[in-house]
Amino acid sequence: MKIAVLGAGAMGSMLGAYLQLGGADVTLLVRRKELAEKFGAPGIVMRSYTGADGEKTEIGPIPMKAATDCSGLDVMDAVLVMVKGCDTKSALTGAASIIGENTKIITLQNGIGNTDIIAESVNKDNIYYGCVNMSAIMSAPAVLDTGLFGDVNVVFGSVTKGEDQKKFGDELAGIFNASGIKAAYTEDIDTEVWYKLLVNISVNAGCGLVRLRGGEAGNDQDFTLLAVDMLKEAIAVAYSCGVKLDFNYFMTHILPVARKTSGLHYPSMAQDMLMKKAPTEIEFINGAVERLGKKAGIPTPVNQTVSRLVRTIERNYDKQYQDKSAKSGPSFKVKISDKFCKGCGYCIKYCPKKVLTAEDGLNAKGYVKVKVANQGDCIGCLQCSTVCPEAAITISKED
């Protein structure tokens, strides 16, 4: 099966790598030429920490075909869409030459609403959608720190229910399963997608607004009450769409697992709002609940308020308050804990002043050794400590 991945960031390139391991002929489509070259040689490396002692498991390198545009590419059997929801329409327009009459389009993007955008240009019989129980961070070009959780790692269904759709769905799931992860095609996909939406509603936008990691926010009483209010609104809207969700089941079986896996991380929307200053997926998460609630005549005041706050932040990144003292440079000190640092390198990637760098060689875990190279250049922006998944970095202000 010839498959192209639109949006080969951390999640897209991980899924593409697994599809190739399962026997598919995969092409990754990325914006940056240098990243496409890294995907090709030496290839993608997927690594994860397992066990209490932080043992590392590693797959790869996996040489991948990659391109920055679709010129010269054949029509694909399938296209996996992994861009942000706000980029779905433009991504499909750019990929028009590789989408034929029988090409299947699969979206495993966050939230609800992407299938409607895809259906504007693609026959509904060829549209598949679902969600993933996986995580990935690209700590260096073509190097992924990954995690798998849940009983099934990739679950998806189709807009049109029929024998042809089931046949393709089972074939695609078989490719994923052959790679070593668990995948399934189901006709009850809306339940899975809505439960995943609840996970995102409970942590994503809220963490960005209060500037906390998932675990930190989840331990706060008022944040939890806010999340519960948003969840109850979403469940009411889901019922209006014919999807029956169990609040108690979600709170006792799904949310604890999600919090455990994301406790030390900033959710994707928080990263967009705090570090990247980038467009978020609010319209496909809380905004989707707001939009569908209006259509069904169901009030969603909490999700609406959160959506409005996020939109306000997005429109005004360049006007946000900044502590003027953060420009004094030498008055800030960066300290890295050797005990907690696992060497993912994410802090190096996001430091705007290149205060942090990698030493020659690897640390005891076989990862990057991070060091402070230019202490005096630190502006106290907290980007490094914000993105550190192990809370290994502290920034102190010196008198």
Language-model segments: residues:
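NAD(P)+-binding Rossmann beta1-loop-alpha1 motif at the extreme N-terminus of oxidoreductases
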Residues: 1-56
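Rossmann-fold dinucleotide-binding core
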Residues: 74, 110-192, 196, 202
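NAD(P)-dependent Rossmann-like dehydrogenase/reductase catalytic/cofactor-binding core
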Residues: 177, 226-329
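Ferredoxin-like iron-sulfur electron-transfer modules
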Residues: 326-343, 360-380, 395-399
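Iron-sulfur cluster-binding cysteine motifs and their immediate structural context
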Residues: 346-363, 383-399
